Amino acid sequence: MKELASGAGAKVVDVVNQQLTKPTQTYVGKGKLGELLEIVKREKIDTIICDDELKPTQQLNLENALPGTKVIDRTALILHIFASRAQTHEGRLQVDLAQHEYLLPRLAGQWTHLERLGGGIGTRGPGESQIETDRRLARNRIAKLKKDIEKVRQHRQRYRQRRKRSNLPIVSLVGYTNAGKSTLLNTLASSAVTAENKLFSTLDPITRKISLRNGKEILLTDTVGFIQKLPTSLIAAFRATLEEAEEADLLIHVSDISHPNRYEHCHAVNEVLGNLGLTDKPKIGVLNKIDLFPKNYQAHEDTSLIKLMDQFDQTVFCSAETGFGIGELINVIECRTSEH
């Protein structure tokens, strides 16, 4: 969560944890609420970020209990990061839809809600209250965005059909955000895809034709990075993008093995793949960023790494940054796509 907050440009001053048996009206218990109030006053905090999706009433109650603060939940934070990363028309459409669907139940009757989203201002109908007008405008915007995204989906489907006629194997890179997928695509394709040390630096699928050593060619696609507790609204909004993984003949699941939560990240990716019905899709596990380990690192003695490796039928250690292990990965890709 700290990594997400930093990725959104926030300075994390303090972290407060609590386990509750059931949700409260303010998201936290009374004692923890008092602790938060003390921290807010002492550190002059202006923003509280919660690592869950809050109900609209919880968000409002928490803001009222902590005067002068803005309360943001996990979904809003992820949407903010996605919005700042979206570069293409398709990416912006998908983020815009997810934002509107998130904010619709949170509209409080102020025009500023829709102005923040870039929505248009309409004429209020006879006997229509302000909040009804806001909601009508939001629903109209959502309907239009869904139509536009459906056009994008159909365009992608036609494009994929043309690709299939080429009879080239399709390989998709999947993985947790910032695992190194774009860098790996660059290394394999010697292309100039954006590869930054940022969360969600890739929101739109990018496909490159790769020539393998055996003379055969494949189509390699980079996809949007996954994340733990990925909001359902985002999965739905990015369906057109995620369909790239559905159409693949082979998935390359890239994991950042230098990250302390590498197993949890792997599980989160597998969970999303399961939701998409891709659990049984052929996969290669790429254990990336091995260059960040000391030279005397003994992988076979690392029980947490062994646990991670058990998630895959086949794994390859590599560094997309230095090129270590890329030759072995290419050999594995050649072998796994040779029957296509």
What are these regions (language model features)?
Residues 1, 48, 100, 138, ...:
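Residue-level signature of catalytic and energy-coupling elements of molecular machines
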Residues 2-170:
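Conserved P-loop NTPase architecture
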Residues 2-6, 37-42, 54-64, 69, ...:
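Conserved C-terminal guanine-recognition region of P-loop GTPase G domains, centered on the G4
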Residues 16, 203, 210, 316-319:
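Hydrophobic residues at beta-strand termini and immediately following loops
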Residues 19-21, 53-56, 76-79, 224-227, ...:
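Conserved nucleotide-binding/hydrolysis micro-motifs of P-loop NTPases
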Residues 22-26, 85-89, 130, 192-194, ...:
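Flexible beta-alpha connector loops of hexameric P-loop NTPases
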Residues 67-119, 126, 279-284, 291-340:
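Canonical P-loop GTPase G-domain recognition
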Residues 113-235, 242-246:
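Conserved G1/Walker A P-loop phosphate-binding module
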